[in-house]
């Protein structure tokens, strides 16, 4: 007996396992969270899954023929799917193509449910629903509810494969109950484009004063805009919006796809041949596709008119509905060559109705809504701020240049070479001008000018400081204190070389580097429809720019090294090396701080601010460190026109030590000569004339 029971159980299990489970796929164009078409399709999927106890019910979000085809074909070939619900017109072409591939297949048993009223095949089911009737009703509600008598509408349009026949049905419904309405509508080219929908809805409200807006889109974006602007929101995308938004939505219709998906899926499971399915209002509410809902503030009269019209639609054939037969159709069908129903002059056929695309009657078509890209400008206040600061600093530097000329005969200025001092200040002026240009409105010329000015300015400033320091090093850094006459004319070519290197590298950036202004999107925190004008260069230009930075780095390293070498000079007027060293150290330190900031992610405005602040700080700091001590000595210590180091024969401790060492070494050289401390003092006191070419010969005679 036990063996018999076990055998029966095994047979039952075998039979159960041998029964193939029903597998279903549902395709939507958007996520179920859209509170619209896709959500209702998904609810229909869930309803049929529960009703038929389907274990394998999949949902895929996909749109477009190519993407749908690539997604669906491998699944059909490998997963033994029973039913594919292609919910959108977007899926139709791909689903029909795959169905045609396997129409006579003995292995692929998949049935495809597609939207349309075309012919069915062995594996192709057609379903359609009367979308015009519910749009006519929604239009009636809008016409009864509007206070401004201005109604707006948004539709995908012909570019999305949808004619505006349903827009016309909405308008006609509003016109039937309120002849005084003005009707405005946009196409947006898609069933689901939140940005365009939002922009079009805002335009209808702000520009055309529409207080009711309808749509034939997949989501609730248009009504969300209406709610945010304090207008009536109506749900015209098939989702029961009042369940979510409550009394902010005064009217909705909702699809109930479960009523149709269950019998269709059951027919597929029971291997009933495919057929056409049609959904609309029905005398039997259990077979009606649409469920209507009204807000509390909607009058009983309005509700009565709407509900009464639904009963009217269910009582006679669709081809006699008012959106098929009316006073506008005779002239419209003639004008646009659309077919009329036989033996009538004012009734359009279903095919002709689908072909309605141009405005009917006094409909106002506003065209395809396009989003205008907005340009994000650099903050004007920041531009003005940097320009004012740089302008004031230019004025300050010019005053220093005038002071250099006025006090050029004082020891502090004469010993430092007035022409080189002004050349250094000129570099600062060029940098400040470059910063003003840097924050100016961007263009290709501005992109090039700002790099040229800033780099030339830094080459002039840093080059002059480094070359001056090298001269001091060559003069003082010799144990025997031999006279070395190095004139300004001998130094200018070296500063010129610094500029030539800069000019050559910048020329490469300007020409080969393709430095230009471009309009960029998707950078920084720009919105989807915002753009910014930025400067852009190619790989060669970027590599050359790094070469310029390396060149400046090398120049700074040379300057720092020379400053360290001449740290022994303690004569105040000639110890420019101290000021120059401090300047170069400060610049180097700033660069070590700034470079990591620039490498880290920065938006363009922050990057510009960092660069400009750095440029102003480095340049101003360098000039103040270098020039303030000179003017301080002029006004504080040189009342007699000379400093004590110039009036007293006194040398530095290091110089004295070197002189004594030189005396000891030279005393054993019969062909040499020795220098007394007084002679060394004479040498140092005469150095001030090195910057005055006319005094060089007298200086040499004095020190020989």
UniProtKB/Swiss-Prot annotation:
Transmembrane stretches, start-end: 384-404, 420-440, 456-476, 493-513, 542-562, 579-599, 609-629
Keyword Metal-binding tagged: no
Membrane topology (Extracellular): 22-383, 441-455, 514-541, 600-608
GO biological process: G protein-coupled receptor signaling pathway
Keyword tags: G-protein coupled receptor, Glycoprotein, Membrane, Receptor, Signal, Transducer, Transmembrane, Transmembrane helix
Gene Ontology CC terms: plasma membrane
Membrane topology: Multi-pass membrane protein
Chain segments carrying region Disordered: 657-677, 685-704
Glycosylation sites: 66, 104, 256, 286, 308, 337, 343, 368, 538
Cytoplasmic side of membrane: 405-419, 477-492, 563-578, 630-704
Subcellular location: Membrane
Molecular function terms, GO-annotated: G protein-coupled receptor activity
Family, similarity comment: In the N-terminal section; belongs to the BMP lipoprotein family. In the C-terminal section; belongs to the G-protein coupled receptor 3 family. GABA-B receptor subfamily.
Listed name of the protein: Metabotropic glutamate receptor-like protein K
UniProt source species: Dictyostelium discoideum (Social amoeba)
Lineage: Eukaryota, Amoebozoa, Evosea, Eumycetozoa, Dictyostelia
């Amino acid at each position: 007996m036990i063996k018999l029971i076990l055998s029966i159980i095994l047979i039952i299990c075998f039979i159960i396992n041998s029964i193939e489970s029903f597998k279903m796929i549902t395709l939507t164009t958007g996520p179920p969270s859209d509170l619209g078409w896709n959500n209702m399709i998904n609810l229909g999927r869930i309803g049929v899954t529960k009703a038929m106890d389907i274990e394998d019910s999949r949902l895929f979000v996909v749109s477009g023929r190519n993407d749908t085809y690539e997604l669906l074909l491998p699944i059909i070939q490998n997963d033994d799917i029973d039913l594919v619900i292609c919910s959108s017109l977007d899926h139709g072409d791909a689903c029909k193509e795959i169905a045609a591939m396997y129409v006579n297949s003995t292995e692929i048993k998949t049935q495809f449910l597609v939207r349309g009223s075309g012919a069915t095949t062995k594996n192709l089911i057609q379903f359609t629903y009367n979308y015009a009737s519910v749009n006519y009703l929604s239009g009636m509600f809008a016409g009864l509810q509007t206070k401004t008598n201005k109604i707006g509408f948004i539709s995908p349009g012909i570019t999305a494969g949808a004619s505006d026949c349903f827009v016309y049905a909405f308008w006609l419904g509003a016109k039937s109950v309120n002849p005084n309405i003005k009707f405005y509508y946009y196409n947006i080219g898609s069933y689901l484009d939140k940005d365009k929908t939002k922009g079009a809805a805002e335009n209808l409200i702000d520009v055309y004063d529409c207080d009711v807006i309808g749509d034939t889109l997949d989501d609730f974006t248009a009504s969300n805009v209406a709610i945010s602007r304090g207008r009536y929101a109506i749900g015209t995308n098939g989702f029961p919006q009042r369940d979510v938004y409550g009394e902010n939505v005064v009217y909705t219709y909702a699809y109930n796809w479960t009523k149709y998906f269950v019998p269709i899926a059951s027919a597929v499971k029971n291997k009933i041949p495919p057929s056409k399915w049609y959904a609309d209002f029905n005398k039997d509410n259990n077979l009606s596709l649409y469920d209507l809902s009204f807000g509390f503030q909607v009058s009983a009269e309005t509700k009565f008119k709407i509900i009464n019209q639904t009963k009217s639609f269910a009582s006679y054939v669709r081809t006699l509905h008012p959106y098929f037969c009316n006073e506008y159709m005779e002239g419209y069908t003639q004008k646009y060559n659309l077919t009329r129903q036989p033996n009538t002059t004012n009734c359009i056929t279903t095919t002709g109705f689908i072909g309605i695309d141009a405005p009917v009657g006094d409909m106002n078509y506003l065209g395809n809504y396009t989003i205008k890209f907005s340009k994000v400008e650099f903050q004007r206040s920041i531009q003005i701020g940097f320009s004012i600061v740089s302008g004031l600093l230019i004025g300050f530097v010019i005053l220093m240049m005038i002071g250099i000329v006025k006090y050029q005969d004082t020891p502090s200025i004469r010993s430092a070479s007035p022409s080189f001092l002004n050349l250094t200040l000129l570099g600062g002026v060029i940098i400040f001008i470059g910063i003003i240009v840097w924050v100016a409105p961007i263009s290709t010329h501005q992109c090039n000018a700002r790099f040229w000015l800033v780099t030339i300015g830094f080459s002039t400033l840093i080059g002059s400081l480094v070359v001056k320091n090298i001269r001091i090093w060559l003069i003082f850094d010799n144990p025997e204190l031999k006279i070395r006459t190095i004139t300004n004319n001998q130094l200018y070519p070296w500063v010129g070389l610094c500029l030539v290197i800069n000019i050559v590298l910048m020329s490469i950036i300007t020409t080969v580097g393709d430095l230009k202004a471009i309009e960029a999107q998707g950078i920084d925190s720009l919105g989807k429809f915002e753009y910014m004008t930025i400067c852009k260069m190619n790989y060669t230009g970027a590599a050359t720019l790094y070469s310029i930075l390396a060149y400046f780095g090398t120049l700074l390293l040379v300057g720092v090294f020379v400053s360290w070498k001449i740290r022994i000079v303690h004569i105040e007027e000639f110890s420019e090396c101290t000021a120059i060293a401090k300047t170069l150290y400060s610049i180097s330190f700033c660069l070590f701080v700034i470079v990591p900031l620039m490498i880290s992610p920065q938006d363009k405005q922050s990057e510009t601010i960092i660069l400009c602040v750095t440029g102003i700080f480095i340049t101003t700091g360098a000039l103040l460190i270098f020039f303030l001590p000179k003017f301080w000595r002029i006004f504080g210590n040189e009342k007699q026109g000379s400093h004590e180091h110039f009036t007293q024969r006194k040398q530095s401790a290091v110089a004295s030590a070197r002189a004594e060492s030189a005396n000891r070494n030279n005393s054993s050289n019969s062909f040499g000569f020795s220098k007394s401390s007084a002679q060394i003092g004479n040498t140092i006191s005469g150095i001030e004339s090195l910057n005055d070419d006319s005094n060089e010969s007298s200086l040499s005679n004095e020190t020989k």
